[in-house]
Amino acid sequence: MQRSIMSFFQPTTTEGKAKKPEKEIPSSIREKEPPPKVALKERNRAVPESDSPVKRPGRKVAQVLSSEGEDEDEAPGTPQVQKPVSDSKQSSPPSPDSCPENSPVFNCSPSMDISPSGFPKRRTARKQLPKRTIQDTLEEPNEDKAKAVKKRKKEDPQTPPESLTEAEEVNQKEEQVEDQPTVPPEPTESPESVTLTKTENIPMCKAGVKQKPQEEEQSKPPARGAKPLSSFFTPRKPAVKTEVKQEESDTPRKEETKGAPDPTNYNPSKSNYHPIEDACWKHGQKVPFLAVARTFEKIEEVSARLKMVETLSNLLRSVVALSPTDLLPVLYLSLNRLGPPQQGLELGVGDGVLLKAVAQATGRQLESIRAEVAEKGDVGLVAENSRSTQRLMLPSPPLTVSGVFTKFCDIARLTGSASMAKKMDIIKGLFVACRYSEARFIARSLSGRLRLGLAEQSVLAALAQAGSLTPPGQEFPTVVVDAGKGKTAEARKMWLEEQGMILKQTFCEVPDLDRIIPVLLEHGLESLPEHCKLSPGVPLKPMLAHPTRGVREVLKRFEEVDFTCEYKYYGQRAQIHVLEGGEVKIFSRNQEDNSGKYPDIISRIPKIKHPSVTSFILDTEAVAWDREKKQIQPFQVLTTRKRKEVDASEIQVQVCLYAFDLIYLNGESLARQPLSRRRQLLRENFVETEGEFVFATSLDTKDIEQIAEFLEQSVKDSCEGLMVKTLDVDATYEIAKRSHNWLKLKKDYLEGVGDTLDLVVIGAYLGRGKRPGRYGGFLLAAYDEESEELAAICKLGTGFSDEELEEHHQNMQALLLPTPRPYVRIDGAVAPNHWLDPSIVWEVKCADLTLSPIYRAARGMVDKEKGISLRFPRFIRVREDKQPEQATTSDQVASLYRKQSQIQNQQSSDLDSDVEDY
């Protein structure tokens, strides 16, 4: 009969006779006595062995491999194959209610070796290994059967419901173990009679026997979530309370995750998007970078511009409502920038460094990564694939938008000999922490080629929608999540367009998100014009001119208004800013800070202004100047000048500033003033210096002959032609716009197309004959603003010198792609030998424009089925100051074609009338 453990520690009581010690029972009888079939631990509904801190020794070779102490392999609750001799197959440690007679750990019999002081002697595996008996041999098949049962149960586990958390799954398994049918054991004493308290007196010899498992427990590492040892010798009731507490602690965890879905399932492109309920993070938390990556994925999957804007807008709405401090980093990551252009922060990580970082972070061979990049043509996809195949023992914390953006800025600011190693460490750290598609877009951002088709105007449109639909500045929980709700589709569209114009106009005057975003979050979108105004130090996007084909077109357009003609100088745009403190800044047409490029110009600023002038913004053209001959030098001479950190004493190419507009003066913006007033203030407050600072040569006239003569003279004076501008009517300075109030007239316009075109190089053809081994032709494309795609327009092969072809061939090796970018459209054009990353802009001249069934540019704008191509295109120069998004658009191509047709028709009609009159 199985007895409780207390019977071995208690003296004879009045309730019954004292039981004889176990040692008095002959061993032969003890072997024949059947063991208990189920441990009392299970019968008392105690925790399973898997949760018990009392584990069996991990080193199997140190266990006694006899019938008294077999190693246990069965899982908790698994039906045991009973032995006729030993009960040591139970997986759980001996419970306090029973003392297995043959247990090697809790052997309560005096037959155990005991020292004279009453403590059990130390037993070693080698000394205690008994000889194998026939009984052991007969028990081995039973062990094999039990292990087979265990294996089948492991291979066919019960799948818990998907809604259960990890803690609930464990509890469910425990309940299944407890509910398994068991053979009732022999009656024992009540739980109260077997409870061991601290106040009970235990004999020294018994205490010594009890102390052995405690010492073994102390020598083992603590189990996960280990409890005090005494808790495992208590009844089931406290264990139930513990489980209830665990379930209660798990309940708020499930409630927390209910409102914040997993970022892996985040979908900002869904219809009826809710900025709070559909977000994958909570109020006050940092925006996970995976949310931005998922947004980029959705944008990459579509080609419709409106859908792109809507998807990005949904993400921005959630950021505004939940984590407004992360709005600025999200916008810069969407634009693939690190700040305003004037800060000059660029990542500039080459593909070689990027591939090495991917290899070291993922453990792949560099050669295999390079081969995969050559095959796929996208370092981002290769990084994502390499990262997805790696498994980490301890995953890194999830990436956040602010964390990634900060790391990018750190990379851009690192300089010096050791900077490359530091950059490598930062990049490796980012890749190690990446999940899913995060590696793809981090790699693309680092390479400077995010290329989602998200132009600046699209990002601004998305920001305007987000700031309008989900107004910032609301206390959480946000009351208004969709301010456009209730409006008709047409009214909603017009309202969003008006809101977008407010933001775009503000951005034209203050193209600095660092200044705009704080104001937007504090005061709202409609208050931007009041708080964000034009000021020195913040570069403006310059006003641009439309081309014309001849003097007659100019007179026809400006028939009833006064206008002026100015020389069009062949140089680089230079926007001169002088702040109130006297600091001088010079910016390019792309808002890049060129102050370090022109130290000679900065030194002459105090001489060109009157003392009363404290601050101003001048629009000028920097032109190469020959001081000896006192004449303008060709544009190519200016391009040889050093670009950064120029020492004034080492300057060889001198420049002269030709000023033609004044936008800001002494704290007042002049952009709304007419040109006549701006020109007057320019000449009153500044002084000319020959060869250093000169006003643009101009002529106010409406006489066609005088304009023609003035045009001829401009060409003789090494200028491109004329700029014709209105003086009073519609004569404001339209920032960042190509206005019809400014017209450009070149000498070449009178012979053919009204303007040169700035086109993007998307492919290269290998040369033949005189040009073997290098590129002899190139495939060019125009930019489509509506779809934000590049559409092929012509093949170019003339206008190059041998030196230029060699230089182009070398520079383009770093731009090679196995396939074109997804936003490049060629249709029926002949595919080039090598595809190129579309990042180079060339200025091209042609004889005329023609309809083409092959090229896609401007398709559907003039003809439903045909596009427009160039006849006899010729290379002019590289436009280093332009990005692909600033290339000639399809609308401009169609406009040039229409003007060409109109003039041809007018000329033919004039000839017909002359013939009739003759």
Curated annotation (Swiss-Prot):
Where is the sequence biased in composition, kind Basic residues? 120-130
N6-acetyllysine is found on K145, K227
Cystine bridges:
none
Phosphoserine carried by residues: S50, S52, S66, S67, S230, S231, S801, S908, S909, S913
Q: Which parts of the sequence carry Phosphothreonine? A: T78, T195, T234, T798
- UniProt: Mg(2+) 2 binding residues: E720
Q: Which residues bind Mg(2+) 1?
A: E621
> Which residue ranges are recorded for the region named Disordered?
1-271, 881-918
What ranges does the record list as Polar residues composition bias?
1-15, 100-114, 885-910
Q: Where is the composition biased (Basic and acidic residues)?
A: 16-54, 240-259
Q: What does the UniProt keyword field contain?
A: Acetylation, ATP-binding, Cell cycle, Cell division, DNA damage, DNA recombination, DNA repair, DNA replication, Ligase, Magnesium, Metal-binding, Nucleotide-binding, Nucleus, Phosphoprotein
GO MF annotation: an example: DNA ligase (ATP) activity
Cofactor(s) needed for function: Mg(2+)
Looking up InterPro entries in the UniProt record yields: ATP-dep_DNA_ligase, DNA_ligase_ATP-dep, DNA_ligase_ATP-dep_C, DNA_ligase_ATP-dep_cent, DNA_ligase_ATP-dep_CS, DNA_ligase_ATP-dep_N, DNA_ligase_N_sf, NA-bd_OB-fold
GO BP annotations, alphabetical order: base-excision repair; cell division; DNA biosynthetic process; DNA recombination; DNA repair; DNA replication; double-strand break repair via nonhomologous end joining; lagging strand elongation
- What GO cellular component is one of the record's annotations? nucleus
Q: Subcellular location, in the record's words?
A: Nucleus
Q: Region Interaction with target DNA: list its residue ranges.
A: 642-644
Binding residues annotated for ATP, in chain numbering: E566, R573, E621, K725, K744
Catalytic activity annotation: ATP + (deoxyribonucleotide)n-3'-hydroxyl + 5'-phospho-(deoxyribonucleotide)m = (deoxyribonucleotide)n+m + AMP + diphosphate
Q: Which NCBIfam families match?
A: dnl1
Subunit relationships:
Interacts with PCNA. Interacts with POLB.
Q: Tell me what this protein is called.
A: DNA ligase 1
Query: What organism does the record attribute this protein to?
Result: Rattus norvegicus
Upper taxonomic classification of the species?
Eukaryota, Metazoa, Chordata, Craniata, Vertebrata
